[in-house]
From Swiss-Prot:
GO molecular function, one term: manganese ion binding
Cofactor binding note of this UniProt entry: Manganese or magnesium. Binds 1 divalent metal ion per monomer in the absence of substrate. May bind a second metal ion after substrate binding.
Binding locations of a divalent metal cation: 8-9, 101
Protein name: Ribonuclease HII
Species name: Natranaerobius thermophilus (strain ATCC BAA-1301 / DSM 18059 / JW/NM-WN-LF)
SUPFAM superfamilies with a match to the protein in the record: Ribonuclease H-like (SSF53098)
Length: 198
């Protein structure tokens, strides 16, 4: 029997917090309910329910992260690839084939194929997409309690108008990606304003 692993990330384009990556090998004997699709197409409630079902019925799965520090040091693409490797290392069954959403792939001892928009084409990627998004969204709710002034529960760290306004007003928090261009621009502007005061 062939085991296919799907990998997807959550938080690649965000301006705050870790990037999450999930690897998931579905059990051919236990097909997950037909509503598996790109996690962004599902309601939060539906995602939560499916995530529980996937965790229960998948052959093996692992959610890994790359920290803000790693993102700052390596860049977001390399940090995501690092988290992909970590997610694969956490699997208890070796996959025969790994399908990764998008165009980035790590060097791993398995055959790998990248699939653009794979989260809406390949069930194992859809499952990984749901696990990664649910895990990251839940973490962002915790960050919202820690840093309520930024509204993380609403935008999950992505740079909406309100999020940018909050960073301009309060400065970046410890979980903001300070090398991310829009945030770096805010920091540089604030430094220049301070210099003008002297």
């Amino acid at each position: 029997m062939m085991y296919y692993c799907g990998i997807d990330e959550a938080g690649f384009g965000a301006g705050a917090a870790q990037v999450y990556v999930s690897a998931c090998v579905l059990d051919p004997q236990k097909p997950i309910n037909e509503s598996l699709t790109d996690s962004k197409q599902l309601t939060p409630k539906k995602r939560e329910l499916l995530a529980e079902e996937i965790k229960q019925d998948a052959l093996t799965w692992c959610i890994a992260t790359a920290s803000v520090e790693e993102i700052e040091k390596l860049n977001i693409r390399k940090a995501t690839i690092l988290a992909m490797k970590r997610s694969l290392e956490g699997l208890t069954v070796k996959p025969d084939m790994v399908y990764i959403d998008g165009i980035n792939s790590p060097e791993v001892p398995f055959p790998v194929e990248t699939v653009v928009k794979g989260d809406s084409k390949i069930p194992a990627i859809s499952a990984a997409s749901i696990l990664a998004k649910v895990a990251r969204d839940n973490r962002m709710l915790e960050y919202d309690e820690q840093y309520p002034e930024y509204g993380f529960k609403d935008h999950k760290g992505y740079l909406t108008k309100n999020h940018i306004k909050a960073i301009q007003k309060y400065g970046p928090s410890p979980i903001h990606r300070k090398t991310y261009k829009p945030i770096k621009k805010i920091i540089d502007n604030q430094k220049n304003q301070q210099l003008e005061l002297f």
